[in-house]
Amino acid sequence: MLCNLIHNIHKEGYIIIMISFLLSCIGFAISCSLGIIFLVASLLCIYFFRDPIRIVPEGDHLIISPADGIILNIEQVNSPIDNSTQVLCISIFLNVLNVHVNRIPVSGTIKATEYIPGRFISASLNKSSELNERQRIVIESNVSHHTIIVDQIAGLIARRIVCNAYEGQNVNSGERFGIIRFGSRVNIYLPLNIHISAFKGQTVIGGETILAYLEDYPHKQLTAKFI
């Protein structure tokens, strides 16, 4: 049971959780109430850094949600890497209670990664997409070689973005590529000529919820995998 618990916690949380448990032990040595406070904090850290297994729909034509949260906006904007190109931006807001592990939205190849320094205003605000610290990955899909862009965006509390993806890496939809600590936002930029199934206000699950289809989806049968 302990092994399963550790397996379902993201490695970025190990040190923080160990420190919080150590503080709870010290707290109990000082007073019961102080120990309880640190113990509750430890349990909250475990909850925050949880990394549950997901049932990922399989198919190179699928665009899967890269994060848990709620869709704030779906709008046509200029591409963040090419102002002359219009793309569709789906913005997902993650509150502190959401799973913060981020997943690859489409099978393909990582063409570029970029760290962009910035501010730490509330991730629920649209201007955070342009002003806040963020980490970008650019994916070329296996189907039709579409360009899909994912931005991990820091929020008011989130000050730590982790991205393990690297240029030239072959990736599969649903696999983990990073995490953003505490409240944050993830933007995914898609080509206009695809079939959108997501809608504003929708609650999405990273690695499970289908946001869009790259091709004639009604003629393709879906299967799933556990990741």
UniProtKB/Swiss-Prot annotation:
The active site is at 184 (schiff-base intermediate with substrate). It is a peripheral membrane protein. It comes from the Bacteria. Is synthesized initially as an inactive proenzyme. Formation of the active enzyme involves a self-maturation process in which the active site pyruvoyl group is generated from an internal serine residue via an autocatalytic post-translational modification. Two non-identical subunits are generated from the proenzyme in this reaction, and the pyruvate is formed at the N-terminus of the alpha chain, which is derived from the carboxyl end of the proenzyme. Binds 1 pyruvoyl group covalently per subunit. The record marks 183-184 as: Cleavage (non-hydrolytic). GO terms for cellular component: plasma membrane. The modification Pyruvic acid (Ser) is found at residue 184. GO terms for biological process: phosphatidylethanolamine biosynthetic process. Transmembrane segments: none annotated. The keyword Ligase does not apply. Pathway: Phospholipid metabolism; phosphatidylethanolamine biosynthesis; phosphatidylethanolamine from CDP-diacylglycerol: step 2/2. Belongs to the phosphatidylserine decarboxylase family. PSD-A subfamily. Heterodimer of a large membrane-associated beta subunit and a small pyruvoyl-containing alpha subunit. Catalyzes the formation of phosphatidylethanolamine (PtdEtn) from phosphatidylserine (PtdSer). PANTHER family: ARCHAETIDYLSERINE DECARBOXYLASE PROENZYME-RELATED. HAMAP family: PS_decarb_PSD_A. This is Phosphatidylserine decarboxylase proenzyme. It comes from Ehrlichia ruminantium (strain Gardel). The gene is psd.
